Amino acid sequence: MKRPTPFEGIKKFVNKRRPAISEVVREPTAGGVVFRRAKNNEVEILLIQDAKDRWTIPKGHIEEGESSKETAQREITEETGLKKMNVLNWLGKINFRYRRTNSLVLMTTEIYLVQAMGDTNELQPEEWMNGIQWFPAAEALDKIAYEDIEKLMLIGLKKIRSGNLGITA
């Protein structure tokens, strides 16, 4: 009789096949790098902490009939409670893919530079969040969990510092 090796359980786990991908799902999303000027005139960036404790920017799915710019504004309001904002420059697009059971999800996120206006201290995070906070720009860059968003944040900070804050179409 053959004795099982210590690796038999691992082999079974590794060799277990996932179901084949039966569909490709496209999920367009939009969000924003939200900033304000602190009392010392320093730039601060608003980050949210998701359910997995990763710091990121407010973003979400584009609804039917909605532009990416409108989505960015709506999602920022829903996720942060901020009502007054100025959606400025389009910073770029992030493509991300992941597997959801037997589907391949292709997510495209349009990111805008957004200036918070009015009372920016009255934040109302959604229930699923673990945190929401304004960070000095350098600290926000250290906290952000996603490299692609960090790159767009850097582009936004460059635009803020150069005064290149033209309104997008």
Residue ranges and their predicted role:
Residues K2-A38:
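Acidic, metal-coordinating catalytic segment for phosphate/diphosphate chemistry
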Residues F13, D142-A169:
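Charged phosphate-binding loop/patch that engages nucleotide di/tri-phosphates or the phosphate backbone
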Residues E27-A30, N40, K52, L106-T109:
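Short connector loops at helix/strand junctions that flank enzyme active sites
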Residues G31, E44, G131:
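Conserved beta-strand and immediately adjacent loop positions that scaffold enzyme active sites
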Residues A38-E44, T101-L104:
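Short, solvent-exposed loop/turn segments that connect beta-strands within catalytic domains
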Residues L46-Q49:
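Short, acidic/hydrophobic/Gly-rich beta-strand patch recurrent on exposed beta strands
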Residues T56-K59:
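A short gly/proline-enriched turn/hairpin at secondary-structure junctions
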Residues I62-K151:
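Unchanged
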